[in-house]
């Protein structure tokens, strides 16, 4: 392994209407209406301002002109390429947009890209393509302006909110090349990422890989100067990954979430039925972190007021795999519940479903860690 107000979704029913990039009807593999609403119902932690939804009252681009057929995959891809704030006008009913190509962020189109589905839009990869891609070090997406090289430049802040991602597929993408492996729904290298009031169902990446992961999301490090502390954390707020049998996300590692060199704040979130399907652990082809896979050095994982349930890893950490290689990182679980995450081939003693290497034992605060 490598060394403001939050609007809660209740009774969300996303489905029925669907359209592809051609504007004609299409049927997604997963019906989002089958899924639970966004967020852990018993999660009531206060969300800091940095983790709250963004204002989208003055959008840069509105995808659609009032009908489901006008909300095409091509229109969404073009909106992402243009940057700014994106909203949707797809008519009164929930709509699923099935993509035939990945929407890619360009690093020279502003410092923030916000995608707001208005609690009615689902983005689908159709089981064939990744949904959303950002990388500060992919020259095809233009290196970000400003000081430093692509690794140290802050890049774009990507925000997705009030939206559902289904059937994203990042299988077969080479590790280390342009387009980056892992992250069936979202792959983000560099920059920063915030996810608020979102749902992720049946997103996948490769079944085998040592560090490769993130069936739903893969985030790779935005580097900072030596001694400057960890990079800006990923925010995952009031969101659902899986949530019921048949809707979980999967990959070699980190069935739902995966990262290298990245810190996370996860609040009021449900992660269940996700699977790390690899085998052989880091010396082989993965299988670590059924729900969450965190690898790196000076990294921090904070899980607050959340539920991790019925996730599975073939090797270590069916709920959480957290490894700080130089033992400077830390993990804290607060006001949360983990249960039904079966033991793989290894885990940390007295922490069912966890494998932790950090500067100190995992900090468990007012939480239940159950088998």
Question: Model regions: which residues?
Answer:
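C-terminal motif of bacterial Sec signal peptides marking the signal peptidase cleavage site
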Residues: 15-18
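Right-handed parallel beta-helix
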Residues: 117-119, 155-169, 192-206, 223-247, ...
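Short glycine/acidic-rich loop motifs that flank beta-strands on beta-rich extracellular proteins
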Residues: 125-129, 169-176, 204-212, 245-254, ...
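N-terminal pre-domain segments of enzymes
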Residues: 27-59
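Acidic Gly/Asp/Thr-rich repetitive segments characteristic of extracellular carbohydrate-active
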Residues: 63-87
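The right-handed parallel beta-helix/beta-solenoid scaffold, focusing on the short coil/turn
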Residues: 84, 95, 103, 111-113, ...
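Extracellular beta-strand-rich solenoid/capping regions of secreted or surface-exposed proteins
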Residues: 77, 81-82, 98-114, 122-161, ...
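Bacterial lipoprotein signal-peptidase II cleavage site
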Residues: 20-28
């Amino acid at each position: 392994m490598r060394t403001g107000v939050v609007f809660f979704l209740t009774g969300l029913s996303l489905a029925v209407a669907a359209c592809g990039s051609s504007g004609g009807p299409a049927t997604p593999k997963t019906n989002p209406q089958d899924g639970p609403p966004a967020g852990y119902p018993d999660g009531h932690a206060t969300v800091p301002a940095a983790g709250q939804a963004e204002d989208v009252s003055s959008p840069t681009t509105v995808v659609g002109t009032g009908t489901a057929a006008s909300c095409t995959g091509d229109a969404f891809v073009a909106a992402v390429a243009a940057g700014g704030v994106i909203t949707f006008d797809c008519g009164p009913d929930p709509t699923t947009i099935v993509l035939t190509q990945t929407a890619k962020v360009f690093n020279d189109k502003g410092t923030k890209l916000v995608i707001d589905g208005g609690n009615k839009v689902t983005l689908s990869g159709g089981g064939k393509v990744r949904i959303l891609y950002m990388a500060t070090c992919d020259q095809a997406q233009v290196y970000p302006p400003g000081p430093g090289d692509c690794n140290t430049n802050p890049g774009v802040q990507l925000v997705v909110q009030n939206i559902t991602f289904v059937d994203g597929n990042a299988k077969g993408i080479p590790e280390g090349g342009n387009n980056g492996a892992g992250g069936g729904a979202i792959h983000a290298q560099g920059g920063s990422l915030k996810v608020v009031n979102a749902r992720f169902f049946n997103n996948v990446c490769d079944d085998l890989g040592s560090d490769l992961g993130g069936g739903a999301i893969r985030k790779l490090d935005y580097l900072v100067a030596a001694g400057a502390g960890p990079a800006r954390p990923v925010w995952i707020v009031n969101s659902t990954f899986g949530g019921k049998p048949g809707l979980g996300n999967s990959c070699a590692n980190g069935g739902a979430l995966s990262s290298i060199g990245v810190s996370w704040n996860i609040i009021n979130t449900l992660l269940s039925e996700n699977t790390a399907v690899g085998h052989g652990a880091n010396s082989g082809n993965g299988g670590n972190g059924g729900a969450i896979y965190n690898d790196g050095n000076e990294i921090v994982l904070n899980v607050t007021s959340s539920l991790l349930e019925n996730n599975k890893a073939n090797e270590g950490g069916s709920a959480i795999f957290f490894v700080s290689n130089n033992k400077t990182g830390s993990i804290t679980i607060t006001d949360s519940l983990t249960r039904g995450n079966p033991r793989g081939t290894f885990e940390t003693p007295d922490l069912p479903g966890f494998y932790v290497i950090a500067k100190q034992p995992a900090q468990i605060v007012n939480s239940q860690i159950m088998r």
